Swiss-Prot record:
The gene is sgrR. Keywords: Activator, DNA-binding, Repressor, Transcription, Transcription regulation. One of its GO terms (biological process) is negative regulation of DNA-templated transcription. Residues 163-492 are annotated as: Solute-binding. This is HTH-type transcriptional regulator SgrR. It comes from the Bacteria. InterPro entries: SBP_5 (IPR039424), SBP_5_dom (IPR000914), SgrR_HTH_N (IPR025370), Tscrpt_reg_SgrR (IPR023767). Activates the small RNA gene sgrS under glucose-phosphate stress conditions as well as yfdZ. Represses its own transcription under both stress and non-stress conditions; this repression likely provides one measure of control over sgrR at the level of synthesis. Might act as a sensor of the intracellular accumulation of phosphoglucose by binding these molecules in its C-terminal solute-binding domain.
Amino acid sequence: MPSARLQQQFIRLWQCCEGKSQDTTLNELAALLSCSRRHMRTLLNTMQDRGWLTWEAEVGRGKRSRLTFLYTGLALQQQRAEDLLEQDRIDQLVQLVGDKATVRQMLVSHLGRSFRQGRHILRVLYYRPLRNLLPGSALRRSETHIARQIFSSLTRINEENGELEADIAHHWQQISPLHWRFFLRPGVHFHHGRELEMDDVIASLKRINTLPLYSHIADIVSPTPWTLDIHLTQPDRWLPLLLGQVPAMILPREWETLSNFASHPIGTGPYAVIRNSTNQLKIQAFDDFFGYRALIDEVNVWVLPEIADEPAGGLMLKGPQGEEKEIESRLEEGCYYLLFDSRTHRGANQQVRDWVSYVLSPTNLVYFAEEQYQQLWFPAYGLLPRWHHARTIKSEKPAGLESLTLTFYQDHSEHRVIAGIMQQILASHQVTLKIKEIDYDQWHTGEIESDIWLNSANFTLPLDFSVFAHLCEVPLLQHCIPIDWQADAARWRNGEMNLANWCQQLVASKAMVPLLHHWLIIQGQRSMRGLRMNTLGWFDFKSAWFAPPDP
């Protein structure tokens, strides 16, 4: 019998007997464990061989045998839990231990660096599962980061300085305003072993042609081996950067036939997905990666929803030794903001917008927040920390305003906290705030009726590119803000848009109301090198490494 199963049987027996040695019979014990008399005898003999108990059998009808426990079920449970932790079987650990506080304590004690069988393993604690990693779908901040570790694209944007770099394409050139040519590397392999072909690249880029920022791609052809020509319907100075974004990452052309591709995707990036469940995401360095192999062999993201209630609990990778703790932080390039929905009467009413943005001002939100949040929130007066576009102007409450509907996406504790503060403030003005909490896909499409939406945006480098690209990618914003998005996209592609002025107009009209900038924090270890937090609050796994202990 496998050791894990035997341990479970012993723990169950110990619990049924309340840990007390006693006189009993095989039949009674077999009934406790719901097994045959013969199997019970085998179990007892095996457990006795392990030194967990003694079984002094008495022969004869009516005679009772002596069962003596030498080991406690709690001790064995702890040993089993340690084994499950080492094997990264978090789902089984939760079932075994049951108590969430105990599970959390065990997980935290095993965070950070681990060195096993010559492999460097990084363990990270996160507050929610990362189940959808499909490029081109509605991805949140953390899923966007993980997708960049799994997939490659024609180009890549350096997370630290925002500069454009080669990826699958080693060079490219603009033949004409409507014609670009990319030269691709041969010998690139997918995680499932197949070599990348031009058809994979063409299929991957054609599948995103329905997205607003890629709708101007007219044709994609390969005139010669490892050469890709992209023809446009309008000029686009940003095209090389656009092809380095997550939607444009390269998938195997048969991706739709592969089982559970969204949660277990296959790319050509530095890490391959080994496991992805509600309790854990495990990715492993891809030995056949065409670039520099990752220095950390394995990254395990353990999911513990309970840390969502901790303001700074977004990403933890510190070990148990307090003296090794090191904190990396940065003010996010983006903010929480209110989005007024022009499709509803109250959302489109300028008086409502002016008054709501006045009473729910950034300073009011921070004032009514608990101290733990005040330390992490910074009043926002623009979509970026460097911008000061919003002005707080006193406004009178519109007559007849009695209720408003606010919608945000779930699995985000700070959304609930901010919404609760808003509810409290509006109630003091005799306005009822009705709150809807929906899943991220529903939020992204924006097809639910709501007066106001509570959103957050994290922009990546370079900001001149990503601010408009991010806002234009979200269907919800296009539904709520009645401007000519296509005309603005054309101006942006031509380099004719003043981005700061464009964003200032959105803020001035109260279509978008910046609320709070958030401090992004990683709780790390001093022994880790190359850990540089990006604008998404994560770090590039393949560039991080562990310094060996001093000799």
